[in-house]
């Protein structure tokens, strides 16, 4: 059932767009989502798991199983964004580049972090000086996540060294 939902919500609109683009190259491109991962925060196989669901994966890892992450691509404005900076961040950025070849330096225009579970922010480590050494990569966060990143290492080092630039979000309800 979940594969049907995945195909109908993500793959089919993208495939439809690609097919129609071939038929009519003047078709206006539209923003779209790309599923870059759908596995729980701890990865796959899950650390310490000895159940049958993980046993095969310990022996034969599946390189397609990545921690939950979405890419948003806007081909009109040549922008891309990623939702969650997971432990699989480098591979997910590479996958996103396939859909957004216009990405400057391979880093999207922004990263949205939804909450402070380890699988949603730990990939920020790859933006530091020991790895990519990015410069002011925009990271969109709610106030609690902003406080967490600013007050805790090594994440505050990314802010202090200007590897990332926090973009505060607020929860506003419009009536």
Region roles according to the model:
Residues 1-4:
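N-terminal Sec-pathway targeting helices
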Residues 8-10, 14-175:
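Binuclear metal-dependent hydrolase catalytic cores
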């Amino acid at each position: 059932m979940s594969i049907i939902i995945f195909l109908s919500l993500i793959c089919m609109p993208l495939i439809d767009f690609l097919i129609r683009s071939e038929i009519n190259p003047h078709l206006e491109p539209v923003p779209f989502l790309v599923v870059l991962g759908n596995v729980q925060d701890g990865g796959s196989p899950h650390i310490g798991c000895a159940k049958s669901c993980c046993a095969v994966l310990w022996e034969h890892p599946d390189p397609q199983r990545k921690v939950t992450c979405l890419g948003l691509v806007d081909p009109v404005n040549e922008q891309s964004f990623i939702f969650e900076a997971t432990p699989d961040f480098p591979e997910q950025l590479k996958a996103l580049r396939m859909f957004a070849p216009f990405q400057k330096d391979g880093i999207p225009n922004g990263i949205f972090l939804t909450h402070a579970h380890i699988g949603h922010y730990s990939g920020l480590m790859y933006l530091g000086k020991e790895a990519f050494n990015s410069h002011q990569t925009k990271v969109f966060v709610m106030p609690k996540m902003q406080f967490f990143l600013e007050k805790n290492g090594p994440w505050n080092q990314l802010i202090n060294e200007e590897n990332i630039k926090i973009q505060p979000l607020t929860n506003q309800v419009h009536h």
